[in-house]
């Protein structure tokens, strides 16, 4: 069911979306029913690498909803650089909690700040550190067998019902954002090629074809639930394997289910990140979907990261740096990262009337 866009900003964005030249090459979301604003953002994002400057959106993680989430990370970035991140992230799922009902691990109270952020010139990102449906709650880092995975995929089992209880509450939160006309960079089931989350592999760099198939089924199940069952048409779907593990594209659910591909990359040398060529070969817009230093001693020079993007990873459309000790604000080079000619910050996505120009 289509939702009315209630803010003049969104109306202007709609006007922008339908006023683009008919000869322009348009990149559309995988959801054919995507809202016009979401379509406009997708096309605009996909064309960022054609620009000569202002072509890589900055991003920061704001924390876990009803836990660590606040605007403090944005404020720290502003204090360090004079700029605010173009993208601000919240995680709806506190998968380590063990309440009586697994759905209570989900919270979306961060939506209020995300709506304000969008209306003032930024874009929200939602991630999910999901609790493990093989248990009554919690255990997001507890490994499960493939047979347990199969039970999670089966809607008739207690495990399947627990998954669907979480998905229902997540969809409620996403619905709030859609009602306000807010497009979302949605990054579920990330770092699946690692062995630390229940939805991923169980052994270090050991390929498991059955596990990969089960993951794809889970991803598609979530996509179908959000898009078809709940009719959410404001999501841009982000596929994000870990840069420090193999099998980065093996888990790829298919071009019909992914809008943006990226790498979650923790590094000491930004010139040595693995997987860029592999991910860009999927012919989707590319991003560094989660970044930070491997050594959390304040020594990472983020200036080298933006220089590496320009020299080695030029198709990058955005980055999202983790908060706390991984933040640019407590490492080196934050000002260079945010003030680099290639970087695009909050307020530079739309100019007050429409999205900034698409460059063919």
Give the location of each predicted region:
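Substrate-binding cleft of secreted/luminal carbohydrate-active enzymes
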Residues: 56-62, 289-360
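Substrate-binding cleft of extracellular glycoside hydrolase catalytic domains
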Residues: 97-228, 232
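Glycoside hydrolase catalytic-domain groove-lining segments
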Residues: 246-298, 333-351
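Alpha-helical scaffolding within the catalytic cores
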Residues: 41, 68-77, 108-112, 170-172, ...
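Bacterial N-terminal signal peptides
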Residues: 8-17
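Aromatic-lined carbohydrate-recognition surfaces of secreted/lumenal glycan-active proteins
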Residues: 60-61, 187-189, 219-247, 286-296, ...
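Loop/turn elements at helix/coil->beta-strand transitions in domains of secreted/extracellular proteins
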Residues: 52-56, 83-86, 120-125, 179-185, ...
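N-terminal module-boundary/linker segments of secreted carbohydrate-active enzymes
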Residues: 23-105, 306-307, 348-349, 354-359
